[in-house]
């Protein structure tokens, strides 16, 4: 099993090492480290204001960390590329929909590919080839809209869509670029309960595609980090939960004041098969454990005590989809 764990570490897609971030005298993140493996769907939870969105912006590259490093690994084993700014290897879906109101759903999804693979001079000087390329991009956009159950809405404009439909289009926008990792920043926070459940089922379908790919010895197509304050969502849609919190025992490490939030929880999620039988008592216990450790601890917590994801992989009973 140890050799399998080492092999998994060779498949790390996102590597965060010792990230610190501050704004003036306000310390936000301290020594944040997290490795995410290809094919994982990881939920990142934490109390409001703990720095989840700051960490996400650092991963995206719009707000680089003050110290530490973030790397995205696109190939096999290796150091990976240091994140210095936004790039195609990272896709992001925000809570607020990033759609052009004057484009249809299909055109919105195809737009990123069109911009990435052509230019205005190319369009003007190579118009016949550009038309052929555009037709191909539109076909791909149609495929990805079908994948998120919007095959019937390709010609709708954002103003004619519900909030859930617009968010599905935003997810398809990210998927079509085939990034190494997709980042979801509270993607369902503004939606009603029924719509949230529908979109969670969509994420579970992506999770199932990862499982199917592993069984067929193919590369899992989706690696996702979803930032959310909803514990049920974090546990339900993924195979791993990480917790970021400022309520840890920083005094024992020699600090007079909190140096920022850090990872205090990192464990596998109990649900393995999207359509399989759920052990609700295990699910409920993990929810209580996360709340005690991340959201409402009885006192300062040892930040390393509940970071046991990699150690738990050594136990065959704790193997999750990441090892399939």
Residue ranges of each PLM-predicted region?
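ABC ATPase NBD coupling module
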Residues: 76-94, 124-138, 217-219, 276, ...
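Conserved ABC ATPase "signature" region
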Residues: 110, 114-117, 121-153, 203-208, ...
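Conserved catalytic motifs of ABC-family nucleotide-binding domains
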Residues: 178
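Conserved ABC ATPase signature
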Residues: 157-161, 165
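Helix-to-loop junction immediately C-terminal to a conserved catalytic motif
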Residues: 60
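The feature captures the beta-strand-to-loop junction immediately N-terminal to the Walker
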Residues: 45-47
């Amino acid at each position: 099993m140890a050799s399998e764990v080492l092999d998994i570490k060779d498949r790390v897609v996102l590597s965060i090492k010792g990230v610190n971030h501050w704004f003036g005298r306000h310390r936000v993140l301290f020594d944040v480290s997290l490795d995410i493996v290809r094919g994982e769907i990881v939920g990142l939870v934490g109390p409001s204001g703990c720095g989840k969105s700051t960490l996400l912006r650092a991963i995206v590259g719009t707000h680089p960390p003050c110290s530490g490093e973030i790397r995205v690994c696109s190939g096999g084993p290796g150091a990976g590329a240091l994140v210095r700014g936004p790039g195609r290897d990272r896709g992001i879906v925000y809570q607020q929909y990033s759609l052009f109101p004057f484009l249809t759903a299909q055109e919105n999804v195809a737009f990123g590919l069109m911009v990435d693979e052509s230019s205005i001079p190319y369009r003007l000087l190579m118009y016949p080839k550009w038309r052929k390329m555009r037709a191909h991009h539109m076909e791909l956009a149609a495929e990805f809209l079908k994948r998120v159950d919007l095959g019937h809405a390709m010609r709708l404009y954002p103003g004619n869509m519900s909030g859930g439909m617009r968010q599905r289009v935003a997810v398809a926008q990210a998927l079509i670029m085939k990034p190494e990792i997709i980042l979801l920043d509270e993607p369902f926070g503004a939606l009603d309960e029924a719509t949230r459940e529908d979109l969670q089922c969509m994420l579970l379908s992506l999770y199932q595609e990862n499982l199917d790919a592993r069984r067929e010895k193919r590369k899992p197509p989706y690696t996702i980090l979803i930032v959310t304050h909803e514990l049920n969502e974090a546990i339900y849609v993924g195979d791993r939960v990480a917790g970021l919190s400022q309520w840890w025992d920083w005094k024992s490490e020699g600090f007079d004041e909190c140096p920022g939030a850090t990872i205090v929880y990192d464990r596998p999620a109990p649900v393995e098969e999207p359509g399989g039988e759920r052990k609700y008592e295990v699910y409920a216990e993990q929810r209580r454990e996360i709340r005690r450790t991340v959201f409402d601890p009885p006192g300062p917590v040892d930040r390393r005590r509940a970071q046991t994801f990699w150690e738990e992989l050594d136990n065959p009973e704790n193997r999750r989809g990441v090892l399939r």
